[in-house]
């Protein structure tokens, strides 16, 4: 009997010396390390069923170190009264060993327990194959079932492991603790085994890890906490694509590690299902979660924190939903490098309702990486200095997602990033080969100058310049397409010396919103208008924005100026922002087109541009010029072809009258029309005045009734008809030439009056002009001598005077005609030679010299004081000698009036 006991005991302890096993025999490989982590496989020996049956030992066997073994296909229940189970041997034994029984197929042995203590400190003996034996606190195989509650499992010593489960075994730990002080692992699950941790705490020192292999499953649930000093949870199938995948289900629990390997790693068709989990990786190397070689990663909720990479995806499929990722390194890293060629290079990523924060790159696509389907980001937020880095071709779709940080591209592949459903990108883009698109709900807040391959925008783009660059803000290497809902927002600075947008091809639509903090300084002439090139295209720009707005302090900008935006008329590859006349304001100008020029007092503005009739607006007919304000508006272009002119204040000046367009001119009271030359054939009305300046001739031909008067400061003012001079006084310091009509205006000043043409000009004003009078032809009629001013009269026509004292000296070949019944007195030393005619009344000359040299035809009364009257006297009138002097008649006279 004793010998049989020894044999059974050795079998139960898995002693390496026992080679013959009655019911089952399976020798597993010694300790090995795979490419993706440490795989522990301690040798085990089943309890010999036949020996145990012969001895009746299907109850726990009390061995040395109080080992406990079950292999009877029967249920067993342990409780707190069970003595602590332990093993300290140097071979590969276990404190608790459970195995199924080989009958018709393997029959499971089930053990349940509560309040147990299980510990091991053994292992370390040399294995004949060159390794070291590792002891386990718990060893399960052949479909064994172990369910423990409130159990303390402890390992001490280098060559110890907490749990080994193989061959379809099942382990459940609830409200338990697993304390690992060795180097050879927390647990190893392989060949289809399954372990479930419910509200269980695992504390592992050194490099001890959790290994889930060969189609096994680990469930970490309900508040379980796994703390690994340097280890990881490594979920791996095998080394070929046909090996069955292993699974980790981590729910409402936490895992942390400070090791250089990733805290959770799935490899070779593994399945990582992480639900509301907290995963912490405190080493700058490795990742919090890593999926390799066709692994499926599902993260739902929870928090992932890493001093290295947050989520590492190697040729695998990842779905992240509702999780928060905080990483010092990359938030999410996708690569194809170092993948196993046994598996397809399938990289896929979808992110939904997640928060990804990184100190470096939030989403990183490595160089040489294959992305098989669009990366879809939905209802999520990504934030990092570089929010996206593209090292390989990728299609990224952001739906209602916030991207904060720069987008960079390090390769030359054709990638794309689309923002839709209210997505926002805040940062710069350096991606010359990437197509960026925004739908009508999305926006890009560009922080610094950016480059893209193609840009299609139906949303809102703000061109930022945090670095204060003086160069181009947005460069589109190929095609810029702005759609109907597009909003482009840009702040202009005086430092902008280059176009803010450059592109090879440009299609414009939507709205351009501009702002500026610069102070507007009004120019004195339209020759000083400035412009900025907003968009520089390599091909012709044939479209335009629907509207352009300008948010700037334009309080100093007068109403006749505006800011225009449009294709440069001289270079259709440029889209310009320029100062221009409101007269020609278009749809994309800062203010609507109008014809009002308000020039403030003390200011002058000169228009050299041609003002032509243009498209009417709701408030303007497109052809009328209105001058307002007390300042001066100067029109210098004689090609102006607009309509009416209204001068409501100040001065409207034109060197040439042709600059006034073709319509009527209205001059308000106290306003002035100042002209130098040309022909003013416009009709002039109103209470204002005309000022003729300069040395040239101004001809007025209109039927004018302006009442503010006329001032001639120099040169010649010619009116074919007196009606052209309005009704106001004429202050003449030059030459006034009038052809005919009734000149009722009062004439003053140092200038002269010239009667031109063959018609009759009648003067009726009380005139004081002193520059003399010239009659070049026709008849000049003055009812009173006072109308003829005070200087000489050079008469080559007919001068008709009614009465008064004509003290002016008369000369020339013209004649003098005395009209009316009144008395006209001549007192000048006159030498006119055209003769004198007295139609009626009395012509009085103190001296005969006043009567010129021509004959006198007298039908009235001629009174002469003295002198030699050599003129021939004729007519029915009389001659009266007046005064005390001597009058001598020498002509052959025939007058008959006595």
Task: Please provide the spans of the model-predicted regions.
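Extracellular beta-strand/loop-rich repeat segments of large surface/secreted proteins
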Residues: 409-410, 414-531, 601, 690
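All-beta strand scaffolds that present successive hydrophobic residues in beta-strands
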Residues: 70, 76-87, 102-106, 110-113, ...
């Amino acid at each position: 009997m004793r010998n049989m006991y020894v044999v059974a005991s050795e079998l139960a302890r898995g002693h390496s010396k026992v080679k013959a096993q009655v019911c089952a025999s399976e020798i597993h490989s010694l300790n090995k390390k795979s490419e993706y982590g440490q795989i522990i496989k301690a040798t085990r020996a089943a309890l010999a069923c036949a020996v145990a049956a012969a001895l009746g030992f299907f109850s726990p066997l009390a061995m040395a170190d109080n080992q406990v073994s079950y292999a009877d296909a029967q249920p067993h229940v342990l409780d707190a009264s069970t003595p602590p189970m332990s093993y300290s041997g140097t071979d590969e034994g276990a404190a608790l060993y459970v195995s199924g029984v080989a009958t018709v197929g393997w029959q499971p042995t089930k053990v349940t327990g509560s309040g147990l203590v299980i510990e091991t400190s053994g292992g370390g003996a040399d294995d004949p194959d060159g390794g070291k034996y590792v002891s386990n606190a718990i060893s399960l195989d052949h479909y064994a079932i172990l369910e423990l509650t409130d159990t303390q499992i402890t390992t001490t010593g280098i060559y110890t492991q907490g749990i080994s489960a193989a061959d379809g075994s099942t382990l459940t730990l609830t409200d338990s603790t697993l304390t690992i002080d060795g180097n050879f692992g927390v647990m190893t699950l392989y060949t289809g085994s399954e372990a479930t941790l419910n509200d269980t705490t695992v504390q592992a020192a050194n490099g001890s890890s959790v290994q889930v292999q060969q189609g096994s499953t680990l469930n970490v649930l309900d508040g379980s906490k796994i703390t690994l000093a340097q280890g990881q949870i490594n979920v791996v199938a095998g080394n070929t694509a046909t090996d069955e995948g292993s699974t980790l289900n981590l729910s409402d629990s936490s895992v942390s590690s400070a090791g250089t390997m990733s805290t959770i790693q799935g490899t070779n068709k593994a399945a990582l299902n992480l639900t509301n989990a907290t995963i912490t990786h405190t080493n700058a190397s490795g990742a919090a979660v890593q999926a390799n070689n066709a692994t499926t990663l599902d993260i739902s909720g929870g928090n992932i924190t890493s001093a290295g990479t947050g989520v590492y995806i190697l040729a695998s499929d990842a779905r992240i939903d509702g999780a928060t990722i905080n990483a010092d390194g990359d938030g999410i890293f996708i690569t194809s490098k170092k993948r196993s060629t046994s598996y397809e290079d399938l990289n896929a990523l979808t992110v939904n309702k997640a928060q990804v924060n990184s100190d470096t790159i939030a989403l990183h696509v490595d160089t040489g990486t294959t992305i098989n389907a669009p990366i879809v980001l939905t209802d999520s937020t990504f934030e990092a200095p570089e929010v996206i880095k593209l090292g390989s071709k990728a299609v990224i779709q952001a739906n209602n997602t916030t991207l904060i940080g720069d987008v960079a591209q390090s390769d030359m592949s054709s990638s794309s990033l689309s923002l839709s459903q209210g997505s926002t990108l805040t940062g710069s883009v350096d991606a010359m080969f990437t197509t960026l698109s925004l739908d009508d709900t999305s926006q890009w807040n560009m922080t610094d100058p950016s480059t893209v391959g193609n840009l299609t925008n139906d949303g809102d783009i703000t061109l930022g310049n945090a670095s204060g660059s003086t160069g181009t803000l947005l460069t589109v290497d190929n095609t810029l397409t702005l759609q109907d809902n597009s909003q482009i927002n840009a702040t202009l600075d005086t430092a902008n010396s280059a176009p803010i947008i450059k592109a090879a091809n440009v299609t414009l639509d939507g709205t351009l919103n501009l702002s500026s903090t610069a102070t507007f300084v009004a120019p004195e002439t339209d020759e000083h208008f400035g412009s900025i090139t907003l968009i520089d295209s390599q091909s012709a720009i044939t479209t335009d924005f629907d509207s352009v707005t300008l948010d700037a302090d334009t309080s100093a900008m007068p109403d006749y100026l505006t800011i225009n935006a449009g294709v440069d008329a001289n270079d259709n590859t440029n889209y310009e922002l320029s100062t221009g006349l409101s007269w020609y304001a278009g749809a994309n100008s800062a203010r609507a087109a109008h014809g009002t020029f308000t020039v403030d007092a003390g200011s002058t503005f000169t228009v050299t541009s041609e003002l032509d009739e243009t498209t009417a607006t709701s408030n303007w007919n497109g052809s009328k010029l209105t001058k307002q304000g007390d300042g001066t508006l100067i029109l210098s272009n004689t090609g102006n072809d607009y309509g009416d002119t209204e001068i409501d204040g100040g001065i409207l000046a034109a060197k040439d009258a042709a600059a006034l367009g073709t319509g009527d001119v209205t001059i308000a009271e106290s306003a002035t029309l100042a002209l130098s030359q040309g022909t003013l054939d416009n009709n002039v009305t109103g209470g204002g005045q005309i000022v003729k300046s300069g040395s040239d001739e101004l001809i007025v031909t209109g039927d004018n009734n302006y009442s503010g008067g006329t001032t001639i400061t120099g040169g010649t003012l010619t009116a074919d008809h007196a009606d052209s001079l309005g009704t106001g006084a004429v202050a003449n310091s030059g030459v006034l030439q009038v052809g005919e009509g009734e000149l009722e205006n009062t004439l003053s000043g140092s200038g002269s009056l010239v009667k031109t043409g063959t018609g009759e000009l009648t003067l009726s004003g009380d005139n004081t002009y002193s520059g003399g009078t010239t009659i070049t032809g026709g008849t000049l009629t003055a009812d009173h001598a006072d109308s003829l001013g005070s200087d000489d009269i050079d008469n080559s026509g007919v001068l008709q005077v009614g009465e008064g004292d004509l003290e002016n000296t008369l000369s020339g070949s013209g004649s003098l005609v005395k009209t009316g019944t009144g008395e006209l007195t001549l007192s000048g030393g006159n030498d006119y030679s055209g003769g004198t005619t007295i139609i009626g009344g009395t012509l009085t000359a103190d001296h005969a010299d006043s009567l010129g040299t021509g004959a006198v035809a007298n039908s009235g009364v001629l009174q002469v004081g003295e002198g030699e009257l050599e003129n021939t006297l004729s007519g029915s009138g009389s001659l009266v000698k007046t005064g005390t002097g001597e009058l001598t008649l020498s002509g052959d006279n025939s007058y008959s009036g006595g």
